[in-house]
């Protein structure tokens, strides 16, 4: 419907042509990606990249890749408007820092779980958490798991020593 009204000349110009104050041609490269009802989208892209550069980039790409390219340019332009110095690199860096903090918290929580399981198994030797232990299955032929057997499972925890854990996060 949009294309048919554009052929008749009754359609409103796209956001790019409106901002650039020019007539929106039927074959306007901007119109499929910058609709008239989203003027800020093109305004940011124009401010960061320039209309001529955006036009060149879109002309060089196959039609099926243009939507993704515009989406990327809009994201990068919005990030640059929010953070003029770092742009999207600042957002990526911030997210990477959050990942690093969360991974450290996860490692501490996993180390705490291992620490609590070891302490529980030493305090209550007959009530281990392992389903293969004789006390939990009641079968004398069950294999008993020794701490050496679990060494491979928690080998990545060797870097966390008990002294660095401090007090338990969940202690009262």
UniProtKB/Swiss-Prot annotation:
Coiled coil: none annotated. GO terms for molecular function: transcription cis-regulatory region binding. Expressed in young shoots, roots, stems, leaves and flowers. Residues 12-113 form the LOB domain. Residues 125-152 are annotated as: Disordered. Residues 131-147 have a biased composition (Low complexity). GO terms for biological process: phloem or xylem histogenesis. Transmembrane segments: none annotated. It holds the Pfam family LOB. Belongs to the LOB domain-containing protein family. This is LOB domain-containing protein 4. The gene is LBD4.
């Amino acid at each position: 419907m949009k294309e048919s009204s554009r052929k008749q000349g009754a359609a409103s110009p796209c956001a790019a042509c409106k901002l650039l104050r020019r007539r929106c041609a039927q074959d306007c490269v901007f119109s499929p990606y910058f609709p008239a009802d989203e003027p800020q989208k093109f305004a940011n892209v124009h401010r960061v990249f320039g209309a001529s550069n955006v036009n060149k980039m879109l002309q060089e790409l196959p039609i099926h890749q243009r939507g993704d390219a515009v989406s990327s340019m809009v994201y990068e332009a919005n990030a640059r408007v929010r953070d003029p110095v770092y742009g999207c690199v600042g957002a990526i860096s911030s997210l990477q820092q959050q990942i690093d903090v969360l991974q450290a918290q996860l490692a501490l929580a996993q180390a705490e779980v291992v620490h609590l399981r070891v302490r529980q198994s030493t305090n209550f030797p007959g009530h281990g958490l392992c389903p293969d232990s004789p006390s939990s299955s009641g079968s004398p032929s069950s294999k008993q798991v020794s701490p050496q057997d679990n060494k491979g499972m928690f080998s990545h925890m060797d870097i966390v020593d008990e002294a660095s854990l401090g007090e338990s996060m969940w202690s009262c």
